[in-house]
Amino acid sequence: MAERRTRIGIAGAGNVGRSVARELLDNGHKVLLIERERRKFEPHVVPDADWLFADACEVTTLEEAGAETCDVLIAATGDDKANLVVGLLAKSEFGVPRVVARINEIRNEWLFTQAWGIDVAVSTPGAMVAGVEGAIDVGHLIRLMGLRQGQADLAKLTLPEDNPLVGQRVGDLGLPANTAMVTLVRGGSVILPTPDQVLEAGDEMLFVSDSSVESAIRAAIHGAEPIRALKDLYGF
């Protein structure tokens, strides 16, 4: 039986919403873009997504969008007030499990809390994707942020119980010179990995790598089992 694809709704199809949609689609998720402005409603620019021309601040729009079937809803408009309304409606009226909201004005950051239905509040497209996949990232390599003006990336992989990496030593991974495991997070503890450290299910491994391999990382991790993907990527 085919694995169910995560359904993600995005309110706001401007540059930010489109960028997030493309990355989530590349990662194998099902995406619906909701846009109320005619000039931004351009299905041809993200053809693999579903589109809805409507105002996501309206309950009727979220009903039409099937918000109750969304695993995640992202409020990605350029208006903080709209993002707060979308987040509150998604959580309180439709019970969306995870709501990610874009903060446009830093002075409004204090409002973006669970009181408004917001699980994760972020300000950049990359952080939005990480916020979305934070709830569904087991077995997936997730890019957290760019480093050194985009020349390198910080990414994480959470090991599921059935992953062949479980029980292996860090030293046996054979990572190349341009990729390093910098931290292991286990049970709330931060561990500096050593060659003899044995990996356990649930471990969060943080990697720093050359940004030029990001697309290869994503294609490999999301298109194959993690152990095979890491072998293909890192050559071990």
Q: What positions do the PLM features span?
A:
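Cytosolic regulatory regions of ion transport systems
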Residues: 1-236
